[in-house]
Design a protein with these regions (language model features):
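N-terminal Rossmann-like dinucleotide-binding module
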Residues: 1-63
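Beta-strand-loop-alpha-helix segment that lines the small-molecule cofactor/substrate pocket
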Residues: 82-83, 94-144, 159
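Active-site loop of classical SDR/Rossmann-like NAD(P)-dependent oxidoreductases
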Residues: 29, 51, 307-319
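Predominantly a Rossmann-like dinucleotide-binding segment in NAD(P)-dependent oxidoreductases
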Residues: 143-226, 230-232, 356
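Conserved SAM-binding strand-loop segment of SAM-dependent methyltransferases
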Residues: 65-72
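Contiguous beta-strand/loop segments that form the cofactor/metal-binding neighborhood of enzyme cores
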Residues: 2-7, 191, 197-282, 316-328
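C-terminal helix-rich "cap/oligomerization" subdomain common to oxidoreductases
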Residues: 1-17, 83-86, 285, 321-364
Length: 364
């Protein structure tokens, strides 16, 4: 199979710089992922604001952003800003979006961070506010734009793997917990596992029920309940999915040798795909990988490769899908409305682990 036949990167129109982007936040994910990808894609960033204006000024100088605002409320007044890109902790994001919708005369789209909110009820409120204001809301579920993940989705959509039977993700990696995560009622489930849960939805659709188990991470010193997460998803068509989200990985920071990495696998009735995820090597930009084999071509593995990496290149896809949606007046694939089902799944996993029981998705 020729690499050019695999839909591993979203196709974008060439005139998306017609939209002015305003950025709220100046942390590393904005500085080193969002803005790097936007520069490479030719998107037009008009201004930036942060609760730390000095850091916003540093990022603006580094990434060529013309205007630094002392407060995001000043940024919202600029009529040349049609798109808001939010990069703030999840507990602060809903309040900012409630203010953004008051500027619907010129604001046409919002790219929110994941999780959209820390509860289904609040996420639903935000989605409905944006819909009422006529503002297109997208949620930055950027794992969908990891190139191996998107490539696997293409294989599934084209039927090359047949009917999905089993999907697994085996994560042995150490996230960099930000200080703001100490204030959340959930750590790994809403911050880390949400990537894999949304990925399973992207590949297989919505599950009927879930089972989960969790325990604290020995390395993380602040109080939390959900560090290491184990969970199983059951789908109506018989497909099953499971992830081991191991943020401990053994005492590798405490003196032992390490075995860090993320491997995924999708088995179907007509083929098998497997891959690796490159982000544990960050800040080294390491492309993810995809190998697959089918019953029709059973004598070898096909191994398409690419130079792009999840960090930063996937962020071209999330902002690009929002800009395309605004331009063509269509819902983005990562719409806020769709993301409610991801939030429901995350809450179901958290509940299943907390209450030690099977949770049906309609409960949420």
């Amino acid at each position: 199979m020729n690499l050019l036949d695999l839909d591993y990167e979203v196709a974008l129109d060439q005139d998306l710089n017609q939209f002015g982007i305003g950025v709220i936040g100046a942390g590393f994910i904005i500085r080193d992922c969002h803005l790097v990808a936007y520069q490479q894609a030719g998107f037009r960033v008009v201004g930036i604001a942060s609760r730390n204006p000095a850091r916003a000024a540093e990022v603006a100088l580094l990434r060529g952003i013309p205007t630094v605002y002392q407060h995001y409320r000043e940024l919202l007044k600029n009529p040349d800003i049609q798109i808001l890109d939010i990069g703030v902790p999840p507990q602060h994001q809903p309040a900012i979006i409630r203010e953004i919708v008051q500027h619907a005369k010129h604001v046409r789209g919002i790219l929110a961070q994941k999780p959209l909110a820390m509860s289904y009820a609040e996420a639903q409120e935000i989605v409905e506010l944006c819909e009422s204001a006529g503002i297109t809301l997208a949620v930055n579920q950027n794992m969908r734009h990891d190139h191996s993940v998107r490539g696997c989705r293409d294989l599934l959509q084209r039927g090359l793997l047949g009917e999905p039977v089993l999907g697994t993700i085996d994560m042995r990696a150490i996230p960099h917990w930000m200080p703001w995560s100490q204030d959340l009622h959930s750590l790994s489930t809403f911050v880390m596992s949400i990537h894999h849960l949304d990925c399973f939805r992207y590949w297989f659709g919505d599950p009927q029920r879930v089972m989960a188990s969790t325990r604290p991470d020995p390395r993380t010193k602040f109080s939390h309940t959900d560090g290491i997460n184990l969970y199983i998803l059951e789908f109506a068509n018989g497909c099953r999915a499971s992830s081991w989200d191991d943020v401990w990985t053994g005492p590798v920071r405490e003196g032992s040798q390490g075995d860090i990495g993320i491997h995924w696998r999708v088995e179907g009735t007509a083929g098998l795909a497997r891959g690796t995820i490159g982000w544990p090597s960050y800040p080294a930009a390491t492309p993810s990988t995809l190998d697959f084999t089918t019953r029709e071509r059973g004598d070898y593995w096909l191994q398409p490769r690419w130079k792009q990496a999840w960090f930063p290149d996937a962020f071209r896809g999330t902002m690009g899908e929002l800009l395309m949606a605004v331009k063509h007046q269509t819902p983005p694939p990562i719409s806020g409305r769709d993301n409610l089902r991801t939030i429901a799944l995350v809450e179901a996993i958290f509940t299943a682990a907390k209450e030690h029981r099977v949770v049906e998705l309609p409960e949420i």
